[in-house]
């Protein structure tokens, strides 16, 4: 996650935008915190003289205009972006509802539910709006308020975007214990949560297959097509765009410019 944050791991610019919704992110978090495998990722070492990909940072990562990446993500964009955005970034995660409405969310885990083996882990994952308040009755009734640290401590709700940073979660632990006046029950709950969720998550790894920078262009193209025909499948246009991108030709941009120049929107449109 740190290399995504610093821009050393980036995406080929032709890669589609991030498309995972809120429910899918919560399911991924649940799988990872349970230690379940979520599949491998595939990277390409940057610097192949015959492949001229433009690159861009992962959604939510700081701008890295002056950073030359070490590697590009060929497969695993959705999973890695979800993990980075929800478990590492300080920003609210830009995602969408099941119906496609764009939303911004922070992710929490209910410690009481998380340590209870009879409760499905996904049911302990909670997403809240950017203001960290869940409301009902058109905003008039507050169902859950996590807008301050004290509210987090009071409701045993751990902010997931600090879970990969030992210094941050250790400080949260100290403040949590202080808030509860070092109550033995609170201490036991946190230590259970630490051993069952935080420590295993810190040891969790996603397998990575790395193609070296000398891999032939044709092989990279074939691999990209093979790994991107499952999951959220790419369209034929997106696959062709990837092929042209290897020669530093931005097919999508060229198509959109020609469409704008020669055709009206109601005659021809490109579906992303």
What are these model-derived regions, one by one?
Residues 1-22, 26-272:
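Basic- and aromatic-enriched surface patches that contact anionic nucleotides/nucleic acids
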